[in-house]
Amino acid sequence: MRYIIILAVLFINSIHAKITSYKFESVNFDSKIEWTGDGLYNISLKNYGIKTWQTMYTNVPEGTYDISAFPKNDFVSFWVKFEQGDYKVEEYCTGLCVEVKIGPPTVTLTEYDDHINLYIEHPYATRGSKKIPIYKRGDMCDIYLLYTANFTFGDSKEPVPYDIDDYDCTSTGCSIDFVTTEKVCVTAQGATEGFLEKITPWSSKVCLTPKKSVYTCAIRSKEDVPNFKDKMARVIKRKFNKQSQSYLTKFLGSTSNDVTTFLSMLNLTKYS
C-alpha cells in the first residue's frame, strides 16, 4: 500500500510540474533568470557549440537566480533547461551581446581655480569583488559608449547638448574641462555605434555653483559694451577705495573704447 501512495504522489507531482513564467535579464553583464513554477527544479545551461549541459542549481524553487558565471561566450546563444522528474523545458537566449542592457554612467563635477572638470565614469560590470569598466573589452562584446552631456547654466531650462569625443576617454572614463561662473548642472547618456545599438538611461543630474572669484559679462557685439562698462563701474565703486576708483575708472573707459573699436573692425571684416 505504501508503494502505491508513493507512486501516486510522484504521478501527481509530474502532472503539476510546469514553468509558468520565465524572464532573462542582463544589466552590465549581471545576468539573472526569474521564473515561477511548482516544485523544485534542477537548472542547467548549454552554450551554442558545446554538447554538455552545465549544472547551475539543484533542487531549487521558483525565484530569481544569478547565472552570470555560466554563459562562457558573450557572442553566442545559449539555452537554460529546467528539469523536474520527466518534465523538461528549455528556454533560448540569443546571447549576451544582443540581450545585455547597459546602465547609466556616473557623472562628477569638480571645481578648480581656473576651470571646472566634468568626469564621466563608464558603467561597470562586477566580477567577484572587482568593478570592471565596460569599455572595449573582448569579454564584454567590445562595447564602448559615446557620450552626450546635457549642460544647463544658471536659470535656463533649455539644456545645451555636447558630444564627448572618444579621444577624451580612457579605459575608466571621459574627462573634459570648461569654464563658467554660473551654476551648472550636467547629465549624460551613452550610446554605441554599430549593430548592437545600446543606449543607456540618462545619468543622475549633478550640479555645481562656482565660487565667484571673477566677475564676468558676456559681450557679443559692440552694443553690449555699455552694459559691460556699467557693470564694471559698479564693481569698481563697491570694491575699491576712492584713490583706486579714479585710476580704474579711466582704465575702464579706455578699455571699453578699445573693445568697441575692435568689435567694429570685426564687423566690417565680416561683411567685406
Swiss-Prot record:
Glycans are attached at N42, N150, N267. InterPro entries: CR4_N (IPR054752), FN3_sf (IPR036116), IFN_gamma_rc_D2_pox/mammal (IPR021126), Ig-like_fold (IPR013783). It comes from Vaccinia virus (strain Western Reserve). Pfam families: CR4_N (PF22325), IFNGR1_D2 (PF07140). GO terms for molecular function: cytokine receptor activity; receptor decoy activity. Keywords: Early protein, Glycoprotein, Host-virus interaction, Inhibition of host innate immune response by virus, Inhibition of host interferon signaling pathway by virus, Interferon antiviral system evasion, Secreted, Signal, Viral immunoevasion. Induction: Expressed in the early phase of the viral replicative cycle. Belongs to the type II cytokine receptor family. This is Soluble interferon gamma receptor OPG193. SUPFAM superfamilies: Fibronectin type III.
